[in-house]
From Swiss-Prot:
Protein name (record): Bifunctional protein FolD
Role according to the record: Catalyzes the oxidation of 5,10-methylenetetrahydrofolate to 5,10-methenyltetrahydrofolate and then the hydrolysis of 5,10-methenyltetrahydrofolate to 10-formyltetrahydrofolate.
Stored Gene3D superfamilies: Leucine Dehydrogenase, chain A, domain 1, NAD(P)-binding Rossmann-like Domain
Involved pathway(s): One-carbon metabolism; tetrahydrofolate interconversion
Organism of derivation: Cytophaga hutchinsonii (strain ATCC 33406 / DSM 1761 / CIP 103989 / NBRC 15051 / NCIMB 9469 / D465)
UniProt keyword annotation of NADP present: yes
Keyword ATP-binding in annotation: no
One GO term (biological process): methionine biosynthetic process
Family to which this protein belongs: Belongs to the tetrahydrofolate dehydrogenase/cyclohydrolase family.
Amino acid sequence: MQLLDGKITSDQIKEELKTKVEAIKAKGGKIPHLAAVLVGDSGAAVTYVNAKVKACELVGFKSTLVKLPETITEADLLAKVAEINADKDIDGYIVQLPLPKHIDEQKVTEAISPDKDVDGFHPTSLGRMVLNLPTYLPATPYGIMQLLERNGIETSGKHCVVMGRSHIVGSPMSILMARNTNPGNATVTMVHSRTKNLKELTLQADILIVAIGKPEFVTADMVKEGAVVVDVGIHRIDDATKKSGFRLLGDVKFDEVAPKTSYISPVPGGVGPMTIASLLMNTLQAAALK
């Protein structure tokens, strides 16, 4: 068993980006600028956004954090989105999800200019991805593709089972893995909460990508010997023995599944850092298009 270490792989990407930014600076070009919109102060969201801002600084990007109160109206948030769309200095931005219940996430996502949609959630971005046209790929699936490619995982002709069908991970992941690209060219099966023969299908997976949002759902008896397992889940579980008061778990029961695998991504330190690296790659692309 080998670890698909997202921290090591994302650090490689950040070093490459840092070199590119230094070259842009040397030529007197525009430094890529990523903005993040944070509504409210939920602990997990603050942690994610701070990690994104820190990563920007590390590679030499300019970053802006827009903090808004949880009580903000939908209209005021949409006005802020329109303002960022019009800001010529900002190359790309994200609106950190989830948003408070009184705000329509889809409406906000669709209000983001596709040119600045570095999270890759806008219908235009997703449509272009399906057609294999140049676009911003959704950050987490893009990060997983990079993790597979940079660790030399063969995907062509393999059976890839994607657990979960969200538009953020599961659906785009299944499309990317089936495309005539490298990585890609896999035979893809998507399973979800209504799948009747779940275990039968997961046991056929050469590559198992798990994004179902249930802590430690995937157990050793669901995974075939030598499979590649990518765990997208991340859950905060209360733990009084930890200084932070919680521990992080994935969707896969790591300790019992890991010995059966050829490669497995840990939680934390697997997909999470790769999502941030992909966001930076998309932002550099956005800046280059200007």
